[in-house]
Amino acid sequence: DFSVEQLRADLHGLTPEEHGFTYLDVDREPSGRGRLSGWVLSAKDLCDVRGMPTTLGNTDRTYYPERSDAFIEALEKQGARIIGKSSTPELGLRVDTEPVGLPHPDNPLYPGCTPGGSSGGAAVQVARGLLRAAHASDGGGSIRVPAAACGVVGFKPAGKELGVQGFITRTVADNAFLHGHRMITPRARIGLLVEPLFCDANVD
């Protein structure tokens, strides 16, 4: 269950280091209805969401946009519910997630370690089971690195621009659906590999 009501319950007692949000508005409604109705997402804190502060990973840079980025607007028009902003390092320029003036999210798989970056807050939210999916962006690994670090699914779509918009999800099927492909029934998960298979092997 990834409803807003369940999210409220799951957030109870969690610290910002544990949930990876820089801002929350769980009462926010989507601007339309469509194929994404029922999906509850966060937006990476490099992207503008109307009515929410954008910090760009540094509280000294905070501003309040009058409108959302085009990608976020499109998600909301399709019925997605954007309920907050996910943590990112300043300007998304690092492969950790240590924003200036804000809490640093913790890796759910390896407490005390970085979740990777720059979409680290998004990966934390999905890996902890708070969200089914979270908006992310990738120029040089910013979706793929935190997804790998937190044991979730990250995909950088092909595009002409260096930085592209995408998602971190729990399953490949969810990622494909959010990118416009038909929904398929995910196969049962047999196991999750969290350690290298041959970590103790000798290297000649």
Descriptions of predicted regions:
Residues 1-64, 91-93, 198:
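Short, well-ordered alpha-helical
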Residues 36, 161, 185-187:
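Short, flexible coil/linker segments at domain boundaries that flank nucleotide/cofactor-interacting
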Residues 41, 47-50, 77, 180-204:
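Gly/Ser-rich, acidic/histidine-flanked active-site/gating loops
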Residues 42-44, 136-137, 156, 193:
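Short beta-strand segments
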Residues 50-51, 135, 143, 201:
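Activation segment
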Residues 54, 64, 68, 118, ...:
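Short, conserved glycine- and acidic-residue-centered signature motifs
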Residues 62-63, 112-113, 201-203:
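Residue-level marker of alpha-helix boundaries and capping positions
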Residues 68-179:
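Short glycine/serine-rich loop segments
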